[in-house]
């Protein structure tokens, strides 16, 4: 969490392009849809980037610019106001911003004069109008169904990601209305809605048939976690006279779902509303309606890298439906999402053969065993062979299954030598070339078509996990930016962890970062050459380590950090993206190019020089990242025209001895000098941190 707090601090200053919401959030394969994006700092957007294949888009030219005449007044008056200080994290209409300012004055006695209030409202409304960007998105007829990430890029840089769903159902757009004039739809379909006004309600009229099991599945929170601050959707199912038959306001956390069996032929109406009657341009939803499955898993839930996956979807309301799917697995091993016509499912992808049923001969290890417990008490047994040391890892909850798989390995003599249960892992030595028995069962003897599992038995290796944040990095030509890399050493990892970037665009480079064995956070520096051309491109961050069992290599999971109720939160993304845009307004450097020498009881001043250029005269916020755990340096603001600040590296009360007694043979701890304006975060590079020559003398004085 410390890393989240640190990164959130820098994000609060850097006003990078941000997509808070867009409408609609999806389209049918083979169609083109106009999408409205709302957010902050989106003016000048000219590129649309989508993950995967089959989804392309063009940003429409135009869009208003922010009138920043009264931005300094807003910063002065609203910098400490929770409701008004972070417009980049919210999407509200111009009228809603005006009402919020007046409410803060009226209810909280905010010290804002009527004249200043008008100016602040003018700035916020200008930002709201400029946050509107329109793009046309084309979905190819053969585009795989599922969830895609969309980003845009502006002269300021690359934006945060927003989710976009490709479906194979007819799509409609919901509008504000009344019960008596409910919108006629034909099931199955997907409805796209947005509540921009307070008190807005959407009504959908359909024909139901006796005995038909219909599902109404609304997606909002699952597409945008920040929506919980302003959108709590509610579903109500009504008969033709308006009598309530079913209601739900939260099945997938805040996303409602109704599973209903129609009692008789007739007309029925589904009502969609907000629990508190609120409206917001970011209150956007997609609503799947019809005879559709949910809580689904893919059977078998495992595939070999790059191979075709021929299986079927199981879950609730799948009886009588044709749910066969045939998709291709990605080339990267690990847990991944695969899109199907019935929703996205989690699948484990492995480089080893996948076995889906017991075979008459022994299975040569390594291998993956995948299937489902179709009936209560069902047990599967496999004969396996292959001497060596192996990891046994089980997957059930992680693939969306209600099962708790238990894997028991029996020796040639029938005695139990290893077992794992649930989403767990264990190591075992198979010393004999004789056959062993793998027994798979559901831990509580339950069963059903959706009780899927997979168990991988692979050569033992060190286990390493890694995340990288932020997921979107913007560079200026000739400058650098830092990416925080957090590692978790699970099993058998020893020594340094090397972190590097792969697939960077031409003109962008990075040096390998080393995370010593006594640290779990490092900073990867990306640098754009002085002549780097404008570009927006995904890339990968990879961490590598060694252990007694060999080498571990893992791709870092990209994370976007955002604020919810002023607390930093992280959401996983599928790609890291780097952009080269704009020009340098400033640089920063240490006045003394020497190691930072820390002391356990007193502060160490660190002078930082600010070099301004191209007429830039705004605020620059300066900080040090990656200090040893017993020291901290408060960030400093270099106001307009200021060209030097001093950071105080001081003890924070934690035990300094682990660092003071640190083995000199370990790789040094590197601090990162970072500085940012409203538009850009700049990293100076790594600076070694060492103990001062007289550091331990201060501790002697305590005695």
Question: What do these predicted ranges mean?
Answer:
Residues 107-130:
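C-terminal capping alpha-helices of c-type cytochrome domains
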Residues 74-85, 120, 124:
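The canonical Cys-X-X-Cys-His
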Residues 65-80, 98:
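Sequence/structural segment immediately N-terminal to covalent heme-attachment motifs in c-type
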Residues 54-64, 130, 468, 505-519, ...:
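Low-complexity "stalk/linker" and mucin-like segments enriched in Ser/Thr/Pro/Ala/Gly
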Residues 129-136, 254, 321-323, 518-524, ...:
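Aromatic sugar-binding surface patches on proteins
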Residues 15-29, 38-57, 61-62, 194-284, ...:
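Acidic, Ser/Thr/Pro-rich low-complexity intrinsically disordered segments
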Residues 1-10:
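Bacterial N-terminal signal peptides
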Residues 13-64, 129-197, 273-284, 288-375, ...:
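Ser/Thr/Pro-rich low-complexity tracts
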């Amino acid at each position: 969490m410390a890393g989240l707090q640190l990164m959130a601090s820098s994000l609060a200053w850097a006003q990078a392009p941000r997509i808070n919401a867009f409408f609609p959030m999806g389209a049918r394969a083979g169609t083109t849809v106009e999408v409205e994006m709302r957010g902050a700092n989106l003016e000048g957007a000219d590129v649309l980037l989508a993950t995967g294949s089959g989804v392309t888009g063009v940003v429409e030219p135009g869009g208003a610019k922010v009138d920043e005449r009264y931005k300094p007044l807003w910063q002065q008056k609203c910098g400490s106001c929770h409701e008004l200080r972070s417009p980049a994290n919210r999407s509200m209409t111009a009228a809603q911003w005006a009402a919020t300012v007046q409410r803060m004055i009226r209810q909280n006695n905010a010290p804002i004069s009527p004249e200043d209030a008008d100016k602040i409202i003018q700035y916020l409304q200008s930002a709201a109008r400029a946050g509107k960007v329109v793009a046309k998105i084309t979905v190819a007829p053969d585009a795989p169904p599922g969830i895609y990430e969309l980003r845009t890029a502006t002269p300021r840089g690359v934006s945060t990601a927003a989710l976009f769903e490709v479906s194979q159902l007819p799509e409609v757009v919901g509008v504000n209305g009344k019960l008596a004039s409910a919108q006629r739809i034909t099931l199955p379909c997907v409805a796209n809605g947005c509540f921009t006004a307070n008190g807005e309600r959407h009504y959908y009229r359909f024909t139901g048939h006796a005995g038909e099991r219909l599902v109404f599945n609304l997606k909002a929170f699952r597409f945008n976690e920040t929506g919980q601050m302003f959108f709590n959707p509610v579903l109500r199912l009504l008969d033709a006279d308006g009598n309530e038959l079913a209601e739900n306001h939260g099945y997938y956390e805040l996303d409602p779902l109704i599973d209903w069996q129609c009692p008789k032929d007739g007309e029925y109406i589904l009502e969609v509303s907000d629990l508190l009657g609120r409206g917001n341009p970011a209150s956007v939803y997609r609503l799947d309606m019809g005879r559709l499955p949910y809580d689904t898993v893919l059977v078998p839930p495992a595939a070999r890298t790059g191979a075709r996956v021929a299986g079927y979807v199981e879950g609730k309301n799948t009886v009588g439906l044709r749910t066969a799917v045939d998709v291709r697995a990605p080339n990267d091993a690990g847990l991944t999402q695969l899109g199907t016509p019935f929703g996205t499912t989690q699948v484990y992808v492995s480089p080893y053969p996948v076995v889906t049923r017991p075979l008459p001969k022994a299975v040569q290890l390594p291998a993956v065993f995948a299937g489902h417990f179709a009936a209560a008490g069902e047990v599967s047994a496999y004969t396996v062979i292959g001497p060596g040391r192996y990891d046994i890892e089980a997957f059930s909850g992680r693939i969306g299954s209600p099962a708790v798989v238990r894997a028991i390995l029996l020796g040639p003599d029938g005695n139990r030598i290893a077992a794992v249960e649930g989403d767990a892992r264990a190591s075992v030595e198979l010393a004999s070339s004789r056959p062993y028995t793998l027994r798979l069962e559901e831990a509580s003897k339950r069963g059903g078509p959706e009780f899927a599992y997979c168990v991988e038995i692979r050569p033992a290796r060190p286990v390493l996990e890694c995340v990288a944040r932020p997921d979107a990095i913007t560079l200026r030509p000739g400058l650098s930016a830092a990416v925080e890399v957090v590692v978790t050493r699970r099993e058998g990892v020893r020594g340094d962890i090397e972190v590097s970037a792969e697939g960077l665009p031409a003109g962008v480079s990075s040096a390998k970062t080393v995370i010593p064995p006594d640290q779990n956070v490092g900073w990867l520096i990306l640098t754009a050459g002085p002549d780097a051309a404008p570009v927006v491109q995904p890339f990968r961050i990879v961490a590598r380590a060694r252990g007694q069992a060999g080498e571990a290599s893992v791709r870092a999971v990209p994370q976007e950090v955002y604020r919810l109720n002023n607390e930093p939160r992280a959401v996983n993304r599928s790609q890291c993206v780097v952009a080269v845009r704009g020009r340098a307004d400033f640089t920063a450097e240490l006045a003394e190019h020497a190691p930072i020498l820390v002391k356990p009881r007193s502060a160490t001043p660190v002078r930082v020089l600010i070099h301004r250029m191209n007429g830039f005269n705004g605020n620059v916020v300066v900080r040090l990242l990656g200090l040893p755990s017993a020291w901290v340096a408060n960030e400093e603001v270099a106001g307009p025209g200021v060209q030097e600040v001093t950071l105080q590296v001081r003890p924070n009360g934690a035990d300094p001895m682990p660092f003071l007694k640190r083995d000199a043979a370990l790789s040094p701890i590197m601090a990162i000098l970072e500085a940012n304006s409203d538009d850009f975060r700049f990293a100076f590079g790594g600076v070694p941190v060492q103990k001062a020559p007289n550091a331990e003398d201060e501790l002697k004085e305590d005695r």
